[in-house]
Amino acid sequence: MGGKRGVFHYLQRTAIQGSPTMISKIANNYQYGGDYIQTDVHPFKRHFEELQVGETIITAKHTVSEADIVNFANVSGDNFYAHMDATSLDGTIFTGRVAHGYFVLSKAAGLFVDAKKGPVLLNYGLDECRFVKPVYPGTTIGVRFTCKEKIAQEKRNPEDIAKGIVKWLVDVYDETGETVAIATILTMVKKKNQD
């Protein structure tokens, strides 16, 4: 087997080893734990071409309250015992009433989203979501919001908006700096050049 087919065949078995920073640079795909580029300009104010893989904002923080948990349960209908009944936690991994994982993710979105109209056209989805540490009332959370990957899209027709998909690493952390939730979200972002 020769030519391109042979190269692709053997590349399927290739693994790259290195630090998250090195792999991020080689693959142009941000790897968790790698160096990031902290910016003061919110990435939702930037067009697709202006975003850099590894570009990160650190958000404001929010202290989770019992009212947050009750309100989220009322809105979502998720009344799972670990969120609503502190007396039923014997024999579980929880030491007290715990916030909903989806509340933590929703609050993270409230912290990282810039609500003003800009190049971000829409939320395109969610991948790889994990809730890795319980969040109890009194826990303060913040978000490291990092441009993970950019995927250019072709216009479907001349009237279509020139755009691309941006994958973002959402790293929600507590007051100790430990990750409590991690996810990849996708947004559709307008290109500056509409040709």
Give the residues covered by each predicted segment.
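Alpha-helix capping at helix-to-loop junctions
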Residues: 16, 114-117, 150
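C-terminal segments
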Residues: 1-29
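Hot-dog-fold acyl-thioester-processing enzymes
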Residues: 30-125, 192-195
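HotDog/MaoC-like acyl-thioester-processing domains
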Residues: 30-52, 131, 135-140, 144-195
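Short, conserved aromatic-histidine micro-motifs
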Residues: 18-28, 123-135
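A broadly conserved detector of short glycine/acidic/proline-rich loop/turn motifs that flank catalytic sites
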Residues: 14, 21-22, 63, 135, ...
